[in-house]
Structures are given as C-alpha cells and as structure tokens.
Amino acid sequence: MTARIIDGKIIAADLRAQVAREVERVKHDLGLTPGLAVVLVGNDPASEVYVRSKHTQTQAAGMASFEHKLPADVAQAELLALISKLNQDPSVHGILVQLPLPKGLDTEAVINAIDPAKDVDGLHPHNAGRLAGGQPALAPCTPLGCIILSKTVHASLEGMNAIVIGRSNLVGRPLVQLLLNENATVTIAHSRSRDLPALTARADLVYAAVGRPEMVKRDWIKPGATVIDVGINRIPTPEGKTRLVGDVAYAEVAEVAGAITPVPGGVGQMTVACLLVNTLRAACAIAGLPKPSV
C-alpha cells in the first residue's frame, strides 16, 4: 500500500479562494471589510517571515491588514496599551500577537488582554473554555487545519478512533475538543504515555504533534489509517546542512497508511488559511451577521 498524499498546499489554496469569495460578498452586499491586526515584538527572523506571509495572504483575500511592530525591549504596559487600542478599533476584527514573545514579557497576560471576540488565534481562556464545553468558539488555527485536512479524506469523522499525540494548549488539547465535536472517539497521548505504539496502532486517525523528529514509526500505524503530521523539526544532514521533518517517519509510514500529510507541504500550509477563516468569522460575528459559508 502506498498512502495518498494529503496536499496541504492545494487544500490551503482552495480554502483561501473560498475565503476571498466570501470576503467579496460581505464587502459588496453588506459593506463590511474584515480586518486583521498582527503584532510583532522584536526582530526574530522566523517570526518576521510568518508575519510577512500573513500580511500578503490577508491582502490577497481582500481583507484589511494592519501590522504593528514593537522593539524587543518594549514595556509590558506599552504592549497591553496597543492591544487595548486594537480591541476598541472597529476596523479590526482579528488580533494576533506573534509568538513567542521576547523574554521579560508575560505571554499569558498578553493573550488574556485580547478581546475574545477578536482572538483569531483561539488562545484566550474564554474561547478555550467554550471549545471545551462544545460551544461555538474561535479555535486555534493549526488544529482547525488538521480537521479540514482530515475531512478531505473522510466525509465524516463520526465514530472513528482518533489519537492525538501531544497535549499542548496550541495544538493537542484544542484538537481533542474539535475531534469530540466531530463525534470521533478520541485518545490523547504524549511522550510519556505508556505503550504508545500499541495505543497508536488502534487508531483510524493519527495526529502527531509532540515535537520529536520522526518519532512515529511504521509499526505504530494501523494499515489504511490517516496520518496528520503537525511536527516541524529541523535535523542535520550528512552534508552538514539541515532539513525539515515531521514527527512521523514519513517514508516508512507512507507504505502502510491510507493517507498522510507531508512535511513540509502539509499542516503548515493550513495555519494561515485558517487564520483568514477565523478573521472572516470574527468579523461577521462582531457585525451581528450570519456565520459565513466557509
């Protein structure tokens, strides 16, 4: 068996196109232009790349894009004041603070300062609590992308056995809640779970988000299972360079899985696309409009 490759690049492009069509509709019919504000603190090169990508894709979708760059030594009070200003700005419907923040800043306090209605990263305790309670909420973008990718393979996840390897607040925990909302039967595991290979081998859906390069091996996977690899790890090559790999040993797992996401080109492609989805949904909710079709 050779696994079907779940091409995140193509799926994300289609999702962005759907968002753009909905944005055009709400702008034309309702006079609403969704707006996303991204706050970047410091000059971390990787963060700058992510922010540029978000800016480009936000504008391409027809949304308003607002960038706010602050120095690494910015005072906590100044950062919180900016967030308060964005909370009150009617042209801003989504607020994202690029993480990680420089040392000395209280990340939890910053996230908690964002208006939950504009929390398009889905990290505010209000949204996390609503998600855990099975209520409508803005969900973190990467787990949302995982669900969308899974549903390109399976029209319904209802009744399927799923395992989430990883328990972070950013991916693992919210992904479990989203899967429960899809009526999947979910096991949450982590690097210290006992007999992890046996747990994983029972799953129809495997989500690897533990941050360990190529940890999930071929003999962990039930034949025909769908494998969603959230990991992004850089490892050295014999030539003295580095390459990106996921948490799944891709080449060997692809021989037994029914479908699998590559790294790169899988889940990572979906994160910004789902950020656009959340921004559109937030804009409609704030304006008292029906939930968009995407």
UniProtKB/Swiss-Prot annotation:
Binding site for NADP(+): 166-168, 191, 232
Function field: Catalyzes the oxidation of 5,10-methylenetetrahydrofolate to 5,10-methenyltetrahydrofolate and then the hydrolysis of 5,10-methenyltetrahydrofolate to 10-formyltetrahydrofolate.
Catalysed reactions listed for this entry: (6R)-5,10-methylene-5,6,7,8-tetrahydrofolate + NADP(+) = (6R)-5,10-methenyltetrahydrofolate + NADPH; (6R)-5,10-methenyltetrahydrofolate + H2O = (6R)-10-formyltetrahydrofolate + H(+)
GO process terms (BP): L-histidine biosynthetic process; methionine biosynthetic process; purine nucleotide biosynthetic process; tetrahydrofolate interconversion
Entry similarity comment: Belongs to the tetrahydrofolate dehydrogenase/cyclohydrolase family.
EC number(s) recorded for this UniProt protein: 1.5.1.5, 3.5.4.9
Residue runs in coiled coils: none
Protein name: Bifunctional protein FolD
GO CC annotations on file: cytosol
CDD domains: NAD_bind_m-THF_DH_Cyclohyd
Signal peptide: none
Molecular function as annotated in GO: methenyltetrahydrofolate cyclohydrolase activity; methylenetetrahydrofolate dehydrogenase (NADP+) activity
Keyword list, A-Z: Amino-acid biosynthesis, Histidine biosynthesis, Hydrolase, Methionine biosynthesis, Multifunctional enzyme, NADP, One-carbon metabolism, Oxidoreductase, Purine biosynthesis
Pathway: One-carbon metabolism; tetrahydrofolate interconversion
Entry-linked Pfam families: THF_DHG_CYH, THF_DHG_CYH_C
The organism's taxonomic lineage, starting at the top: Bacteria, Pseudomonadati, Pseudomonadota, Alphaproteobacteria, Hyphomicrobiales
Subunit relationships: Homodimer.
Keyword Nucleotide-binding belongs to the record: no
